[in-house]
Curated annotation (Swiss-Prot):
Signal peptide: none
Name recorded for this polypeptide: UDP-N-acetylmuramate--L-alanine ligase
Listed GO MF terms: ATP binding; UDP-N-acetylmuramate-L-alanine ligase activity
NCBIfam families to which the protein is assigned, alphabetical: murC (TIGR01082)
Organism of provenance: Parvibaculum lavamentivorans (strain DS-1 / DSM 13023 / NCIMB 13966)
Length: 491
C-alpha cells in the first residue's frame, strides 16, 4: 500500500531540511516517490538527504520547482515564499506537512506522541521497544535517533511511530491508533491565541483515537490530569509516579549511571496488577523516567513482553541534542541539550545534578524574544539546580527584539530572584575562556538552547584544549545519554 500513486509526479518540499520535513521526505523517497526540495542552508539534514540521492536546492526561488507536481510546506513557510507563490500561480496542490504525514499514517497502525515537552525522546523510546520486539516499525521523529543515525526509517512492520508536533495545531489531523500526551504547558500561544485553545487542541488529538485504540496520558501533570476528565468514550491508560497511575514508577534511584526504578502495572478494567522490578534506563532525570513510562504504557497495550521492554530501555542509545555528551576537558564533562523552554531547562538541570559529583554549570542561549518575554518569570526561576549560569544573547529566529527580553534582562532577573552566580556571555568566542575560569575538575557543563549554541557545545572541548589542559573526545557512539557513574551527591 502507498499513500498515493507513484505517478503523481515530483514532490517538492519547501524547507526540506527541517527536522519534521526531512523525515517525511526520507520515508517517501524510500517508498519510491520522486522527491526533491529546497532549504535556506546546507545543514546536516540536507547533507543526509543528498546522500540518499534526493535533489536539494540551497536557496528558495520559483525555478526550483521545475517539473514538480505537488509541493509540501510547513507552518514555517510564509505566504510570500517564492516557491509557494509559484506553486499557486501554476495551480499545483499545496500540502501541509501534517497532511502528508497523515497520508503516510493511514497505511499502518500508528502511535503518535504529543505534548509540549518530551515528544522526541518518547517517540524514540517507543520505537526502540517496538524494534526490540521485532515489530520493525516505520518511524518519523523530531530528532536524530542515535541508533538509526537519522530521524526517520521505513520499516516493514504494521506499526508506525510518529512525533506529533502541536506548534501549528495540525496534529489534530493525525490518525493515531494510540496517542500519548506527555504534558501540556503554555507554548505556541502566538498560534493558539490562548492556553485554553491549546488545551482544546490536545483534547481533539486524543478524541481522534478510534474505539479500539487508547490514549496514554501522564497523570502527574496537572493539565493532563484535567484533560483526562474531559475525555469521553475512549480508553485511557495513565502513567506517572501518582498512586492512581496505571503505569506507576516507584523506588526510583540512580545506579552506575542508569535511572533504575520499579514499575507497577494495573489493568484498570480487570483490576489485575503486576510489577516489573529494577527497570534500568540509560538516561538521567525524572522527566526521562516519565517518558519511559509512556513507552511502557504503549508496550503493555500491544502485548509486548517485559523482557523486550527491559532490554530496549537498558540499551537505549538516546537522541541527538538530548543531554548528549560531547567531550570532556580537565575532568569537566560537557553536554549539549535542546532544552529551550523553562520546564525543559529545569528538567535537564535536575538530570545534570544526578549525573555529576561536582557542580553544574548551565550555558543558555534563549530562543526567540517572544518566548523569553512571555515566560520571563519562569525563565528567572528555572535555573535553581545550576551552580552557575552563563547567559548568551537571544537567538532571534527571525524575530525582532522586544524591550525587556534580552540577555542582560535575564541576567538581572536571575540575580534579583536570588541566584548567586550569573554571568553574561559577551559572545561565543568568549565561552571557552569563561568556562576555563569557572569550571573545576568534576564539574558538568550543559549548553542549552534550540539555536546555534549546539555548535558552541560541540566545539567547546577542542576550544578548551587550545587553552591548555587535557581533552577527552566523545566516542562515536557516545551520543548515548547515559552519563558517567555518579560518586557523590544524591546517592
Amino acid at each position: 500500500m502507498r499513500p498515493a500513486p507513484l505517478d503523481i509526479g515530483n514532490i517538492h518540499f519547501v524547507g526540506i531540511g527541517g527536522i519534521g520535513m526531512s523525515g517525511i521526505a526520507e520515508v517517501m523517497h524510500n517508498l519510491g516517490y520522486t522527491v526533491q526540495g529546497s532549504d535556506l542552508a546546507d545543514s546536516a539534514n540536507v547533507k543526509r538527504l543528498k546522500g540518499l540521492g534526493i535533489k536539494v536546492f540551497i536557496g528558495q526561488k520559483a525555478e526550483n520547482l521545475a517539473e514538480a507536481q505537488v509541493i509540501v510546506v510547513s507552518s514555517a513557510i510564509r505566504a510570500d515564499n517564492p516557491e509557494l507563490m509559484e506553486a499557486r500561480a501554476r495551480f499545483l496542490p499545496v500540502v501541509r506537512r501534517a497532511e502528508m504525514l497523515a497520508e503516510l499514517m493511514r497505511l499502518k497502525s500508528c502511535v503518535a506522541i504529543g505534548g509540549t515537552h518530551g515528544k522526541t525522546t518518547t517517540t524514540s523510546l517507543v520505537a526502540a521497544i517496538l524494534d526490540k520486539a521485532g515489530l520493525d516499525p516505520t518511524v518519523i521523529n523530531g530528532g536524530i535517533i542515535n541508533a538509526y543515525g537519522t530521524n526517520a526509517r521505513l520499516g516493514g512492520g504494521e506499526w508506525m511511530v510518529v512525533e506529533a508536533d502541536e506548534s501549528d495545531g495540525t496534529f489534530v489531523k493525525l490518525p493515531a491508533t494510540i496517542a500519548i500526551v506527555t504534558n501540556i504547558d503554555p507554548e505556541h500561544l502566538d498560534y493558539y491565541g490562548s492556553f485554553d485553545a491549546a488545551k482544546d487542541a490536545f483534547l481533539a488529538f486524543v478524541e481522534n483515537v478510534p474505539f479500539y485504540g487508547a490514549a496514554v496520558m501522564c497523570i502527574d501533570h496537572p493539565e493532563v490530569q484535567a484533560l483526562i476528565g474531559r475525555v469521553r468514550d475512549r480508553r485511557i491508560v495513565t502513567y506517572g509516579t501518582n498512586p492512581q497511575a496505571d503505569i506507576r514508577a516507584t523506588n526510583a534511584r540512580v545506579e552506575d549511571g542508569f535511572n533504575v526504578f520499579d514499575v507497577a502495572i494495573t489493568d484498570r478494567k480487570t483490576g489485575t496488577a503486576r510489577e516489573m522490578t529494577g527497570v534500568r534506563l540509560a538516561m538521567h532525570g525524572t522527566h526521562n523516567m516519565l517518558n519511559s513510562l509512556a513507552a511502557i504504557g504503549v508496550a503493555t497495550q500491544m502485548g509486548i513482553a517485559d523482557d523486550k521492554i527491559r532490554a530496549a530501555l537498558e540499551g537505549f542509545g538516546g537522541v541527538k541534542r538530548r543531554f548528549t555528551f560531547v567531550g570532556s576537558w580537565n575532568d569537566v564533562n560537557i553536554y549539549d541539550d535542546y532544552g529551550h523552554h523553562p520546564v525543559e531547562i529545569a528538567a535537564v538541570l535536575q538530570a545534570a545534578r544526578s549525573a555529576t559529583k561536582g557542580r553544574t554549570i548551565a550555558v543558555v542561549q534563549p530562543h526567540r524574544y517572544t518566548r523569553l518575554h512571555n515566560l520571563f518569570d519562569e525563565f528567572c526561576a528555572c535555573f535553581n539546580d545550576a551552580d552557575a549560569v552563563i547567559v548568551a544573547d537571544v537567538y532571534e529566529a527571525g524575530e525582532k527584539p522586544i524591550e525587556g527580553a534580552s540577555r542582560d534582562a535575564l541576567v538581572e532577573g536571575l540575580r534579583d530572584r536570588g541566584h548567586r552566580n550569573v554571568m553574561a556571555l559577551d559572545g561565543p568566542e568568549a565561552l571557552p575562556r569563561l568556562i576555563a575560569e569557572t569550571a573545576r575538575p568534576g564539574d558538568l557543563v550543559v549548553c542549552l538552547g534550540a539555536g546555534s549554541i549546539t555548535y558552541w557545545a560541540n566545539a567547546l572541548p577542542d576550544d578548551l584544549a587550545k587553552l591548555g589542559g587535557k581533552k577527552k573526545a566523545a566516542a562515536k557512539s557516545a551520543a548515548k545519554t547515559k552519563a558517567k557513574p555518579k560518586k557523590g551527591r544524591g546517592k
